[in-house]
């Protein structure tokens, strides 16, 4: 089996590849043949000169565009992933901690996401603006699970379809002067809510925050760790609505 792994890291986020690549090589689908696409503004950085790594150069966008536009970035390199059986996007700062089999990741469903550690037993912050293509109000959708945008993917053809659809939806929102509350995560959750029975949902231990969330660490095995970052050095995360167009 071949798995395509997508990394996006510009500015200081590129440095995470030094942890990301060896951890994925050691722990993630160890029996599979893994290929990486690294989107970065540092295409000449030697940290990306690794086996089975293809570098795709992008410029560094300010928050929230660097995350909002990820579907568009990926949609432009689908030809590189054509030979893959599965494709998986993993945040630059989400690092595998223990062996994770191919079956464990993807299950028997066509898509995969991870339950958001902050919204396990309650409804998550789905987009409520009916004018956004990510909006979930006035729709008959399954909102039983809210996933975090740090980890998602699926079988190749289903992944390709998801990327294409969400790239188009984000473009439509931007053309209408709209940005969803949680950017790409809002669009991903709308897409999953439309086809819940096709989504294999990983437990929150696949997105364990490095700091806090002790209840998550007690209840679930930490399979992947979301590294803690000083927001002064990594000013990427600004919270809901930051950068929203009116």
What are these regions (language model features)?
Residues 1-69, 77-83, 227-233, 241-246:
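N-terminal anchoring/stem segment of glycosyltransferases
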Residues 10-13, 43-45, 60-61, 94-96, ...:
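Short, solvent-exposed loop/turn segments at secondary-structure junctions
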Residues 15, 45-47, 96-99, 104-105, ...:
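Short catalytic/ligand-binding loop motif for oxyanion handling, primarily in non-cytosolic enzymes
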Residues 67, 71, 94, 181-188:
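Conserved glycosyltransferase catalytic-site signature
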Residues 71-122:
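GT-A fold catalytic core of metal-dependent nucleotide-sugar glycosyltransferases
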Residues 124-128, 184:
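Feature marking well-ordered beta-strand scaffolds used for ligand recognition
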Residues 128-144:
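Short, flexible, basic/aromatic active-site loop/helix in glycosyltransferases
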Residues 139-230:
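Catalytic core and acceptor-binding pocket of nucleotide-sugar-dependent glycosyltransferases
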């Amino acid at each position: 089996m071949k798995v395509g792994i997508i990394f996006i890291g510009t500015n200081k986020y590129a440095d995470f590849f030094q942890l990301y690549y060896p951890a994925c090589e050691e722990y993630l689908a160890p029996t599979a043949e893994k290929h990486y696409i690294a989107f970065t503004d540092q295409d000449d950085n030697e940290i990306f000169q690794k086996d089975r790594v293809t570098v795709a150069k992008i410029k560094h966008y300010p928050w929230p565009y660097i995350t909002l536009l990820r579907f568009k970035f990926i949609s432009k390199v689908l030809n590189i992933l054509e030979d893959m059986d599965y494709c998986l996007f993993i945040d630059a700062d989400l690092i595998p901690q223990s062996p994770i089999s191919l079956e464990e990741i993807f299950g028997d469903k066509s898509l995969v996401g991870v339950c958001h550690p902050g919204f396990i037993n309650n409804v998550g912050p789905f987009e409520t603006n009916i004018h956004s293509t990510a909006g979930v109000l006035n729709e008959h959708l399954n909102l039983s699970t809210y996933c975090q945008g740090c980890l998602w993917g699926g079988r190749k053809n289903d992944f390709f379809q998801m990327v294409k659809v969400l790239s188009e939806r984000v473009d439509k929102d931007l053309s209408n002067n709209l940005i969803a509350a949680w950017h790409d995560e809002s669009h991903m959750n709308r897409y999953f809510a439309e086809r819940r029975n096709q989504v294999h949902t990983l437990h929150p231990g696949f997105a364990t925050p490095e700091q806090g969330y002790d209840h998550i660490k007690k209840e679930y095995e930490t399979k992947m760790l979301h590294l803690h970052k000083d927001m002064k050095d990594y000013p990427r995360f600004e919270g809901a609505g930051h950068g929203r167009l009116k």
